[in-house]
Amino acid sequence: MKKMRLMSLSLMAALAMAPAFTASAQCKKAESSCCKKNTDACCKDAKQEGVYTQDYSNDPKLVKAAQKWYKKGKWRNGFKKADAHSSVNLVDFYLQYQKNPEQWKALFDFIAKTDLLAIPGGKHPIPGSNLTISVEDSKNNPLEKRGSESHYHHIDFQYVVKGVERFGIIDHLTSKPNCKYRPDVIHYDYDKSRARFYDSTPDKFFIFFPGDWHIAKIANDTDNQDIRVIVIKVDYKD
């Protein structure tokens, strides 16, 4: 019994090191904007909708500023091959770009000027930065063989340049960590019926921030599961 208690305390301590991974704070914030009205129906609706990313709806000026910034396009730094997928949290993108412009500029400059189909597979340094691009020639797999994850210290920039990769984003309200936080990743048990799925093609890129608990390389509905995807981990700035 004492050993089990120590293990439980150890897991709790590990999770406490990664506040972005615990659903409670995110869920309470998401529900509070609705539930402060003290209506059971409103609370029920909030839970039914789920929580899939950081919520900024209580700051409409910030949301509008982020949308305007994205549309203006200076962030592209010459990159015009693809746009952000509709699931990308534009406020997180906007805020993180302002806090860490050097890495983001280097990222977009590199993928704008590089033939991403011709570059050899493997990891390559991005000039003028401490970033590394991982060029992965891989295959999608059935959902049950893929794990969910999120990261606290890094942001996943993922861009499929060949083929179709299916991504999943899981609901915070019905998910819970199933392991210790190991820098810089944690995994979850989740309700598949509450997950949202998106197919990524070469005209869109995805960005997964700490509040985006995701699943990658899920099999799509076609006969071809071969993909080439680039993954760049950008530092997350508090």
Where is each model-derived feature located?
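Bacterial Sec-dependent N-terminal signal peptides
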Residues: 1-54
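Double-stranded beta-helix
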Residues: 176-199
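Conserved short histidine dyad/triad with adjacent acidic residue
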Residues: 132-150, 165-175, 210
